[in-house]
Amino acid sequence: MDPDLENVIRQALGDALAAGRDHLGQTELAVRAVQRARPDMTASDALTAVNLVWRE
């Protein structure tokens, strides 16, 4: 995975956690962040990328 994209995901997950969001809310925010950073990615691809980071 692209390290910059991974950083976007980790930052979004951290921000969502700090805001008190649950797992689903954190994932949703991270997917939106991925789509802003990489508009060429579909929602499905963005979700896959977020899930890969969750598993690490």
Predicted regions and their residues:
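C-terminal alpha-helical interaction appendages
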Residues: M1-E56
